[in-house]
Amino acid sequence: MRPLTMSGHFLLAPIPESSSDYLLPKDIKLAVLGASCVGKSAMIVRFLTKRFIGDYEPNTGKLYSRLVYVEGDQLSLQIQDTPGGIQAQDSLGQMVDSLSKCVQWAEGFLLVYSITDYESYQSIRPLYQHIRKVHPDGKAPVVIVGNKGDLLHARQVQTHEGLQLANELGSLFLEISTSENYEDVCDVFQHLCKEVSKLHSLSGERRRASIIPRPRSPNMQDLKRRFRQALSSKAKAASTLG
């Protein structure tokens, strides 16, 4: 399953040299979470370089940075890769030490499982619950990704199972093949960047609304002066009538 293709509006750009008149882009901070060997690092590298590399050393948690253009807006994208080792039976408490800092830092999340590994699918729910515990307002966007969609002969997780889980959690679901389709990978990151950017826009509008100056109230000296003027006017009117 895929959303509407958006890759044509998504460009990678080199980070420019610093300049005094260079306008800093918005920061977009994403985290890619999931069990071991589901293709998290491959997804990130595929997105950033368009190349697919199948074999990786065990990940120790790398941070990738790149300038991107989303529908004409320049964004400074940071993607945190995370170590695997998350199992379905892990409690939220067991995940705190290894993931809380990353989850607190990030603004949007990719939860990745492999369609060839049912246990990796079962780890998605506790990961999602941990995100919502750290971000209780429920605004941080989450996309659930079923990776390795080209390995149909080894499938253990059916498409409808991924869709059902995403519906229960209120998240977007996509089933992709990192190795075979760059556009699908790009669409995943594109969607998440747009959702985080929307949050930035909304929070910016709220901040601007909160600092709109209130009408200045007259101070006490002004009130006393007006009161004396009113009394004086009444006194003059009374003496005239008398």
Swiss-Prot record:
Q: Where in the cell is it found?
A: Nucleus, Nucleolus
- TM helices/strands, residue ranges: none
Please state what class of enzyme this protein is.
Answer: hydrolase
The Gene Ontology biological process terms listed for this entry are: positive regulation of transcription by RNA polymerase I
Entry binding sites for GTP:
34-41, 81-85, 147-150
Q: Which SUPFAM superfamilies does the entry mention? A: P-loop containing nucleoside triphosphate hydrolases
Q: Which is one GO molecular function term here?
A: GTP binding
Give the reactions, separated by semicolons, that this protein catalyses.
GTP + H2O = GDP + phosphate + H(+)
Q: Which UniProt keywords are present, listed alphabetically?
A: GTP-binding, Hydrolase, Nucleotide-binding, Nucleus, Transcription, Transcription regulation
Instruction: Give the record's family classification.
Output: Belongs to the small GTPase superfamily. Ras family.
**What is the role of this chain?**
Regulator of rDNA transcription. Acts in cooperation UBF/UBTF and positively regulates RNA polymerase I transcription.
Subunit details: Interacts with UBF/UBTF.
Q: What is this protein called?
A: Ras-like protein family member 11A
Q: Which gene encodes it?
A: Rasl11a
